[in-house]
């Protein structure tokens, strides 16, 4: 005691005195407590109990002495708080007192720290100081953060996680035992059951106790998930076998595996009727119907890709969906639709949208009990036990609002993504497609599904994307990019001025002006009147050039030049001949003019070109396919009126060619593009381009339908993703509606019936009468025959059967006024 400081010695002496007083005289305290309680309690037993409780409360055994082992200190303390204070003040010190020591000099410890807080926290490991107590279990901790971390194990969520993890491990052990016994052919028998007396299907009875492998009931703590025998059937009816890597086999239903023998002979009355098949493992199925996972069944083919995705294992689908929503919560993804987001959506949910597996994964991420409270719409798909036992993510109202706002922004971005792509190609397609694309995910379409009342909905989320995709108006003030000012002024003015802005700009003034005609991608073309067709430059220009050359090199031969000009004039004037029925009477002038010479010149000069409604067609262009004309009673007359001037043109051209070949100028008078030549006629017959664009081509160009296959596939994928995002919003906010929709889709999926070649008839009162479908088919066939009679098919070209002939069981589509038919002219 000589080495103690005065303060420590006084502390020690006071502590020893108090302890000796407590140890030497326990009776007075007992007497006082007994006296105090005797006045209030009437019974002697109450006196004894009260005195005993007061003794246990007041009496404390002396603490174990603590020796300070910092260098050669050697001081002895009996209170951990005093030891800790001694180490911090005397040995560690402070910077203000100029005695700070950041190296622990406790016996056998040389830890160096950077700050005083670090070393004072480290000193606690050398003292039995644990002032922080847990109110639940009474454990003590040195630091408050340790106590806070420990208190988490007493929460309800942590207990659920522990129970779920224990159940999952037990299910994995049970499955490994069953697989092990199946692989070795029963060499290691299962633990005996209480129902072993009832042998089933000739299986031998197992002994009550095996020497090497005791029963599971002997060690109940080793198998916490195995319930008592009365609940054994319930334990094995749970989808615990879906942890099997063989659960994706095609020959067994999803999430199930063949039941071992001990399952059957334990409860024979449960499996007596259908124990020899796998169908009893799928609840709610008729034993006579085939499972949808059978690849040879008709139902499997009807479901297509959805069932094949489910066969790949629902566990991976659960993980992908959970990873998607986990990244969404952690804000690892931006609400912008691009190629990466499209690929992520396709990998997570597939091309079929939300199916049973995806819906269960979405709902299990928020509330596992809501996922399996009802039977799934697809009975062949069993819920995964791993997902069923997976802890639910804590879903707060703010989290749901953020999730909905993210999906709303993503859907609006996907809806405007197609319009932004199509606007780069053409203005007409952008105007039509932007309206259609934004209509897929606008306020009106979302309000039809009740999505305008979900948490986090804001109309501005949809308006931002739509306004960005709209582009700049024609009469809007031009931005700096469209003005003629230098780029140095861009830093002075960031925001684009509006018409109602009265502030002075810091840079040069922006002059309001109209945008150029091609600012929005609009293309303008001049449309000529339909009274006459434009002259063909391929025929007219070479003739003029040839005349000029002839006039330069043959000035002495005026008669030949006049004859050649007469032939050229007759050829050019024949292009401006009307083919209307009213002008068909004028078609005889060319024949007379070609045969009579001077009389032909007079006839050609006197006859002026007609200004009828129909355009004038040259013989070269007449060989092409003309726009179709409505098939009615006037079809034959119209085709006759069209063919008559064409034949007269051909005969006149042949006469001119034969006459010019006899003359000395045969090399000039033979036209290069004469329709009488076989090569040109074959080329003209093979040409399928019409003179004017059809209505379908123009409408498809305006709506963006005439695009490449890649753009069409991207557009189809984008539309599927817009629908997928809308379905996700419905599934998250209205799970019951999503289940009902999946169940309805599952019941609605059917393949079309196989058509037979025998036409159906109705039998009424012994006589056979044609049905309405047959009347429509016969009417359509008669229309088709009328069209073929009115437009003869050239020889050598096969005639294809009509659609109503191929599908004789389906009613033919009635013809509409705007239907186009190709009219072929026999030239």
Swiss-Prot record:
Subcellular location: Cytoplasm; Nucleus
UniProt biased composition (Basic and acidic residues): 535-553, 647-659
Pfam families according to UniProt: zf-C2H2
Major location category of this protein: cytoplasm
GO biological process: positive regulation of transcription by RNA polymerase II
PANTHER family reported in the protein's UniProt record: PH-RESPONSE TRANSCRIPTION FACTOR PACC/RIM101, PH-RESPONSE TRANSCRIPTION FACTOR PACC_RIM101
Described function: Transcription factor that mediates regulation of both acid- and alkaline-expressed genes in response to ambient pH. At alkaline ambient pH, activates transcription of alkaline-expressed genes (including pacC itself) and represses transcription of acid-expressed genes. Not required for the pH-induced dimorphic transition.
Post-translational modification note: Activated by C-terminal proteolytic cleavage by signaling protease at neutral to alkaline ambient pH.
Record's protein name: pH-response transcription factor pacC/RIM101
Region (Disordered): 1-60, 153-174, 233-275, 370-392, 535-688, 761-827
Record keywords: Activator, Cytoplasm, DNA-binding, Metal-binding, Nucleus, Repeat, Repressor, Transcription, Transcription regulation, Zinc, Zinc-finger
Chain intervals with Acidic residues compositional bias: 554-567
InterPro entries assigned to the protein according to its UniProt record, in alphabetical order: pacC/RIM101, Znf_C2H2_sf, Znf_C2H2_type
Span of zinc fingers (C2H2-type): 66-91, 102-126, 132-154
GO molecular function: DNA binding; zinc ion binding
Annotated source species: Mycosarcoma maydis
Any one cellular-component term (Gene Ontology): nucleus
